[in-house]
Every structure is written in structure tokens, then in C-alpha cells.
Amino acid sequence: MGVEGILEKGFVTTTADKLINYTRTGSLWPMTFGLACCAVEMMHAGAARYDLDRFGVVFRPSPRQSDLMIVAGTLCNKMAPALRKVYDQMAEPRWVISMGSCANGGGYYHYSYSVVRGCDRIVPVDVYVPGCPPTAEALLYGIIQLQNKIKRTNTIAR
């Protein structure tokens, strides 16, 4: 957690930033935005074998209850405004994981007229998970990388 010091009376000192970021990493609530075959792997990661609950990741049905969006699959032009609307409804601070080649850059359908060439053109992306489709382990690694990124951010403005 980034313990600053341990005093002789049994007290531990740390900064407010490190404490807040530590608690945020243990309670990521993703809003699932499954668009294609990558969503199946995302569901696989949430099932019993990989059990994202042990990392504090609990899938939420509403954008107002979530702070993480996992964009999994091909994003078409008609779906892009809905993606942005859901992102805007999420509570601050919010993070985005782009899962799969199609969400990262269009993937197999990159040259199609109806496909957005990367969801980072619509919403800011924090972590990219490569693969077609990426495995559940890759998504798990992406979530761990996001947790490490959250621990390094400053939460209190100076």
C-alpha cells in the first residue's frame, strides 16, 4: 500500500493518496460492454475458474454503479454514440479497458466502412488487452495492470 512509516506504538502512517488508491484497486466494478466474441472470454473470466470476485471485480448492470468499462469486441459506427453515452453516465473516477483486436484497432474488420477503428476514438482508454479473442488470463493481466496504474495516480489535487 505504500506504508510511509511504522511507529513504536503500533501505528502505521501513510498518505491519503495511497490509502484512497489502495481501496479503489480492491473494488473495481466493471460495466460490461460486450459486442462480439471477446465478450465470451470476458464472461469466462468472471466464471468460477478465474473468479474475478477475488480481485474485488464485481460486474454491475448499470453504468451509474460502475467505475470501469470493458469494451470487448467490434465497435460499429451505430454503436459508438451509445458507448459514449454509457461512458458519460459512469461515476468519476472511471477507467476503460479495451479488450481484443477489434476494440483496439478494428481488428479483422479494420477496413470495413461501418467499423470504428479503435474505441479510443470514442472514449479514453487506460489499458489495451491484445488478442483475437484474448484469453481470460489476458483480461486478468489487464485488470492487474489497471490496478497498478490506479495505485500510481494522484487523487488529491495539489
UniProtKB/Swiss-Prot annotation:
Report how it sits in the membrane.
Peripheral membrane protein
Q: What is this protein called?
A: NADH-quinone oxidoreductase subunit B 1
Q: Name one GO cellular component term.
A: respiratory chain complex I
Per its UniProt record, what InterPro entries does this chain match? NADH_UbQ_OxRdtase-like_20kDa, NADH_UQ_OxRdtase_20Kd_su
Which purpose does this protein serve, as stated in its record? NDH-1 shuttles electrons from NADH, via FMN and iron-sulfur (Fe-S) centers, to quinones in the respiratory chain. Couples the redox reaction to proton translocation (for every two electrons transferred, four hydrogen ions are translocated across the cytoplasmic membrane), and thus conserves the redox energy in a proton gradient.
- Name residues in a coiled coil: none
Any single GO molecular-function term of the entry would be: quinone binding
**EC number(s)?**
7.1.1.-
Classification lineage = Bacteria, Pseudomonadati, Pseudomonadota, Betaproteobacteria, Neisseriales
Q: What is its main location?
A: membrane
Alphabetical GO biological process terms: aerobic respiration; electron transport coupled proton transport
Provide the assembly information. NDH-1 is composed of 14 different subunits. Subunits NuoB, C, D, E, F, and G constitute the peripheral sector of the complex.
Database matches in NCBIfam families: nuoB_fam, PRK06411.1
Family matches, as PANTHER family: NADH DEHYDROGENASE, NADH DEHYDROGENASE [UBIQUINONE] IRON-SULFUR PROTEIN 7, MITOCHONDRIAL
| Catalytic activity, reaction form | a quinone + NADH + 5 H(+)(in) = a quinol + NAD(+) + 4 H(+)(out)
List, separated by semicolons, the cofactors it needs: [4Fe-4S] cluster
